[in-house]
Amino acid sequence: MLNRLTIRLGLLILATLAPVISGAQAIFVSIPPQAFLVERLTGDLVEIEVLLPPGASPATYEPTPKQMAALERSQLYLQIGAPFEGPVLAKVADLMPDVRIVDCRAGVGLQPIGTDGHDHGAGLLDPHIWLDPGRMKTIANTTAKALQALLPDQSPAIEERLATLHAAIDDTDARVGEALAPLAGQTLLVFHPAYGYFTRRYGLVQRAVEVEGKAPSARRLATVVDELDDQTLRTLFVQPQFSRTSAQRVADALDCDLVELDPLAGDFLY
């Protein structure tokens, strides 16, 4: 019994100290696509922590005290404009002077949230910039510079990996553009307006049921169904982070399929 306890205690201590023993720098990001970027740029040179857990909604999630304690021990936080970042940034600024914050939206060019090609978000900016390959290359550049500052000895390797990543993003962009070209001008019906940048890039029109991260009211649902009833829409896309109940009601009313599509998936390359 004592031997088992000793072994378990030893393993626990080893797991706790592993990042320190390995010498790896701790990097925090907000969402999985950022983690994918950092991994492609650094390999296993850093420990990557993602604030948003699988299945959680960026509109409502609150980081746990355990996550905030881990963030305090990190060297770098890469923000991207997720809704939950505000309180996190305030705490980092007030209580974590050793944590460097880098805004990965720099130079990206934000656009208003649109549900049907127009701004229905009361002036709110669309945070889903990672769904546009061109903008993702800009995000990758900012991320690479932050990592090079943190790991100066690895700067040439990071630069080389950045070039490889750019080529992979360009390849994905070209193939997606070719696949969607015959659908130019058609409507992409989504529950949450996450695909504004994506649809603009590839000549589609996003039409969303939900606005401003709020569950649609019965009146809103009825309006959407009435406006779209004369259109031939075969699919309504819903995020796994949102309840399917309201989305299913719309899909049933329009007699279209309900399909899950995750804009927060880590690997964005096709």
Residue ranges of model-derived segments:
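Bacterial N-terminal signal peptides
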Residues: 8-19
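N-terminal secretory signal peptides that target proteins for export/translocation
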Residues: 1-5
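Extracytoplasmic metal-acquisition and chelation regions
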Residues: 24-270
